[in-house]
Amino acid sequence: MMMHPMNKTNKRDKMEKRNNPSALNIFMSFLKLGMVAFGGPTAIAYVREMVVDEKKWMDEKSFNNGVALAQIIPGASVMQVAAYVGFYLRGIVGAFAAFMAYALPAFLIMLFLTIIYMHVKSLPKTVSIFEALRIIVVSLAANGTLNFSKKNIRTIGDVFLLLISALLFILKFSPFIVIFVSIFIGFLMYRRDITKLSLKIDIPREKLRIYKYVAYLLFGVFLFNLILYMIDSKLFLLSTLMMKVDVFAFGGGYGSVPFMLHEVVDKYNLMDAKTFMDGIALGQITPGPIVITATFVGYIVGGFIGSIISTISVFTPSFIILLSSIPIFDSLKHNTIFKNILHMILVSFVGLLVAVTIRFALLVDWSIQALIIFIVSFLLLYKKYNMLLVVLLSLVLGYLIL
């Protein structure tokens, strides 16, 4: 039985309509996903399920390219994947819609939790709960360190660089210095591989237009910070601080923790380390990446406006970097020099996370009960149990036995 040509056309039109959603459709879909996608990096699986299996907006290969790109640039991986999907579907508007929609639920929930925190943190009944939260943060940092180690530590040289990075951070050297030292070591180790060919980056002509939008965004960032500088020095500090953190947050959201700790606690004394740990812990009760801690920091330092400024600032640089990287991704993923330097950076991140874990552990009042909560939460995280479940179970244990 032959199908009428008109029927074929209608069927094709329906497929194109289904596979090319509007920016509003993208926004609403990622908004819904952002409400339930707990688990940090594991949330990428939820994004894949929605866009590849359920809605069939992308094929597997295209989605995997987005995941691969998110792994080699700074920023929270799941946020970068969301933006990549949006860009694939609707260009710059789609990228912005997916990126903003995915972050919005986490921001609102974190803001709500922070307001509650400010009202109850001094109550006697909440002391044990926040002590349990800090133990969870130690478990989280230890688990993140273990995962980073398994992925990136390959040689004795890697272990040596890890130890140097950890020692420098423990000695209160800036993590930015640690990263630059790692890049320098990487250049020294792989300088023989540097050739004209290895430094060549090909940009397809049809993809050059994206840099026009990147230029607009960079100009917008400049104006944004200029206005903040003129009206409120504290808000300007929050903005530049969070942007700096985001630029160096390789390896996903966990990579931001040492930098944010250094900037917020050590360098500018905006809060003490225990309060910062509380912010990280509250972030685990929300969907979205660990960098949503920026909302907590922003609210404590600058109120509601501060929370908005911090949240926008901690996501903006990585969004711009993603857009800038899409045209050159094919060159980057096969570039030996880039891959080796990135490896050095990620190895140094393991060292930074080791130092952060030690520092956080020293802030906990350890007891047999605290050790039980740590072991239980660490094992559950190691076994990839849902983050929200782990946090809630640990809070119940803390309330009962601490």
Swiss-Prot record:
Q: Which residues cross the membrane?
A: 26-46, 67-87, 96-116, 126-146, 168-188, 213-233, 235-255, 289-309, 312-332, 338-358, 360-380, 381-401
Sorted alphabetically, the keyword list is:
Cell membrane, Membrane, Transmembrane, Transmembrane helix, Transport
Q: Which domain of life is it from?
A: Archaea
The membrane topology of this protein is: Multi-pass membrane protein
| InterPro entries hit by this protein | Chr_Tranpt_l_chain (IPR014047), CHR_Transporter (IPR052518), Chromate_transpt (IPR003370)
What is an example of a GO molecular function annotated in this UniProt entry? chromate transmembrane transporter activity
Asked if Transmembrane is a keyword of the record, the answer is yes
Annotated localization:
Cell membrane
For whether the record's keyword set contains Flavoprotein, the answer is no
What does the sequence similarity comment in the record state about its family?
Answer: Belongs to the chromate ion transporter (CHR) (TC 2.A.51) family.
Write down what this protein is called.
Uncharacterized transporter MJ0718
